[in-house]
Amino acid sequence: GITVNPKIEKLRLKKIKNYILCLMLSQGVPMMLAGDEFRRTQNGNNNAYCQDNEISWINWNLAEKNEELVAFTRRIIQLRKNHQVFHRETFFSTKTPEIEWFDFTGKNPDWSNPSRFLAFMLDGSMCMNGDGKYDNDFYVAGNTDIYDVTITLPSPHKGKKWYLAADTSIEGNDCIAEPGKEECLSEQKRYILPAGSFVV
């Protein structure tokens, strides 16, 4: 519902960014409803086809009001488009480690543990971009717990380093880097991921 509480609004914005990030970095075709990128909720009505009123109309003023989310969505879509590893032409094989799963300690996750953290690494050497070069490796982690977690990062492949592409815990437009402007992490072995956040 409608609120003027800044803490609730901040949490909602972060959760929306988390959902859009997960959608855009998943395999397959991402499906968004017009206006998701600027918080058009239809007041919770997910079956508004017969509503010829404010519920189903698109209020374009929301795009200006929620410019930060529009910019985030634009950049995460660009990240997806720039990297074949996020939209592969074939499904993962079991013969090569195209995708590896991790818990926060950097080990294989215990799938029976009700942890609120999960991470995966996509091997870019298994995908070529449109320019004929192998893609980058990507590590994506989600912490849905109410506590911050210190992640043990997997070792990057030989000659590579980890760069920060997105962190939904960071406020404003700095939560996602412009393509080509990602910052190299000063700490290559660990990363503190705040509660309820995702990092790429």
Annotate each language-model stretch with its function:
Residues 1-8:
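Alpha-amylase-like alpha-glycosidases and glucanotransferases acting on alpha-linked glucans and related
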Residues 9-13, 17, 22-32, 36-200:
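Carbohydrate-interacting/catalytic domains
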